[in-house]
Structures are given as structure tokens and as C-alpha cells.
Amino acid sequence: MKVVHTVGKRRTAIARATAKEGSGKIRINKKPLELMEPKYIKMKLMEPVILAGEALSDIDVDIDVKGGGIVSQMDATRTALGKAIVEFTGKMELKEKFLSYDRTLLVSDARRTEPHKPSKSSKGPRAKRQKSYR
């Protein structure tokens, strides 16, 4: 039985996907994709599923997501799901389709929050006193 493990990251959210032979079920934190709320997040998560089409009919994907907020978790999940579908099927045309639609379906967003600097640490990394000219 073929099993593929992939990872998607966005800020502090990490999604780990496991794809194996099955009947086309997708579960996120043991909850079916169809039951995800709010609707905006469900629709964003459906994008790789809709693009894959019939290629997804014999794949089961289980995704565990931790850290971050709702939107970061959604982006990390999309990336992990997209990578899992492409890696499991091994189809280059599917990879090209994903990349032309939205690059973040296969490539994690590398941006992270900037560390706070020592001077005004609680206020943020670039906080300065407001300058007064008179």
C-alpha cells in the first residue's frame, strides 16, 4: 500500500498530511472537509480538490494541523493537501495546473514574523519615538 507524507507551513501553523489509497475522503483534524466552518475557509480548502478532479477519487488524505490562527492553518492545509495529491499521483500536468492556478498550493510561504529588538521590545521590532520638530 502506497503512503505519502507531506508538510505545509504558514507563519506558526504546521499541517502534516498523509495520503494513502482509499475512496476520496479528506479529513482535517479527524473532521471531514465538507463540515469545515466558516464557508470561506471550506471554499479555499476545496480549491486543490476541484483542480485535481478525478485524480483524487482513489486517495484518502488525513491532515493534522497545529499552531497559528484559522487563516494560517487554512493556508498550511492547502499546501499540505496540494503537495500530497501531486506526490501521490506523480502527474506532472497536475503539478503544472496547481502552479499556474496558485503557487502556494505547492510552495509554503516562507515569511515569518520579525523578532522584536531589545530597545522597545514590547512595542515591536521597529518601534521608534515620534519625532517632534517644535
Swiss-Prot record:
InterPro entries: Ribosomal_Su5_D2-typ_SF (IPR020568), Ribosomal_uS9 (IPR000754), Ribosomal_uS9_archaeal (IPR019958), Ribosomal_uS9_CS (IPR020574), Ribsml_uS5_D2-typ_fold_subgr (IPR014721). GO terms for biological process: maturation of SSU-rRNA from tricistronic rRNA transcript (SSU-rRNA, 5.8S rRNA, LSU-rRNA); translation. Residues 109-134 are annotated as: Disordered. SUPFAM superfamilies: Ribosomal protein S5 domain 2-like. PROSITE patterns: RIBOSOMAL_S9. GO terms for cellular component: cytosolic small ribosomal subunit. Coiled coil: none annotated. Belongs to the universal ribosomal protein uS9 family. This is Small ribosomal subunit protein uS9. The lineage of its organism: Archaea, Methanobacteriati, Methanobacteriota, Methanomada group, Methanococci.
